[in-house]
Amino acid sequence: MVLHDFWTFFIWSTVAGLAVIGIYQLFLLILRARGVFVTRTKFGLTMIFDSEDADSTPIRLLNVNGTFQSVSYIAPELRFELCVHYHRMMAKVIQQVAPEGHVVVMGGGGFSLPKHLATHMSGGVIDAIEIDPKIVSLAREHFFLDEALAVASSNLRIIEDDAWKVLQNADAGSIDVLVNEVFAGRKSLGPLGTAAGAQVVKEKLVPEGVYLADVRCPLEGRGSALLSQVADVFAHEFAHVAYVPEWPDTPKTPGNNLLIATDADIALPEGAVVVK
């Protein structure tokens, strides 16, 4: 009786497993038939597909494990321009404070911001850190990274490593602008959302350096405490802290909120909320 039950369980488990595999393979076939490139990377199922923005301009998107990580224009004349508003704000701040400086971007994805900086700044050094070599390969194949490297007017260095480890090992006072996109999306800011992380950021920046971070959360409701918590942490280390909400008129909508922390007196983007 026990043996019979075992084989019954084994057979039905096998059938169920094969059914799941079959459904998954069918799902992949449907996506590929619709022009979606599907693969697996370090952090899960990864999809690349083309679409259009609100102005009907063709764009390409990178989605990793259900979270959009990057977006790029497809047209050759637009490939190194920025699609999203918070990236454009970041670029303006960087051009303001360090047009020929050392910029470190934590998190690669499709390398939208590093590509833009490398092709719009002259004489600067941009370090773009991505932990997953496969994501770097996808950026080269689908997001025009090699094209940007070929025409860059600044030194764009691609570093395949853990961004937090690279930051910890950086020389003190060696970075003009530090951009944190590593923990954007559904994850918290990890070590960089703590007091110890803020201290490391302060140590690695030049005296009037700037820290920029994408803090994805709503302004009100569930999950909204993240933004104020991170702002408070950095307010203990920097003279000036502000954030620019993506969706100020719909505060319960999760958005890419731009956090700015610095000891310098800089011109803040329009719509900035001053914390300190």
Feature map (PLM): residue ranges:
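Non-catalytic surface loops within mature trypsin-like serine protease
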Residues: 66, 133, 217, 263-265
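Ordered hydrophobic segments in well-structured contexts
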Residues: 45-47, 61, 210, 258-262
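The AdoMet/dcAdoMet-binding core of the Class I SAM-like
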Residues: 79-212, 216, 220-231, 237, ...
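N-terminal Lys/Arg-rich, disordered targeting/topogenic segments
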Residues: 1-3
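Class I S-adenosyl-L-methionine
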Residues: 225-276
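Residue-level signal for secondary-structure boundary sites
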Residues: 70, 221, 267-269
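Rossmann-like AdoMet
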Residues: 5-88, 92-99, 119
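Short, solvent-exposed coil/turn elements at secondary-structure transition points
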Residues: 54, 67, 164, 247-249, ...
